[in-house]
């Protein structure tokens, strides 16, 4: 890459791939009854969705990150919940002591995340991926129109 706008364009293209991966993982979830596979695919979808919204480093642009304005207002709460699941359980262990529920012995659960596969988030995650994908396409068109 030779220019900052080319770097942003490449980042946007990679972000499109992430949204497509989300949709592919959800398609696979909808086609299986295997609970373990559903959890693994859900984890993949969540991580792939949040990745471009996290802080990525560029050569020309110190931070490459999708902007919040690409998330539809009506799905903002679900977006934040999905980011929280990724940050607290999948990518990091950012749990507070209040969230941990200890049982007998060494077993414990995480309050609110008793089961990692949250089927109620499948449709919102699918909608988010589709709408963010469309918004990224618009952003990429603008970048191309203004010249790489």
Segments predicted by a language model, with ranges:
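Amphipathic alpha-helical interface segments
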Residues: 1-81, 101-148
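Short amphipathic alpha-helical segments with coiled-coil-like heptad repeat character
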Residues: 91-103
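Long, charged low-complexity segments
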Residues: 84-92
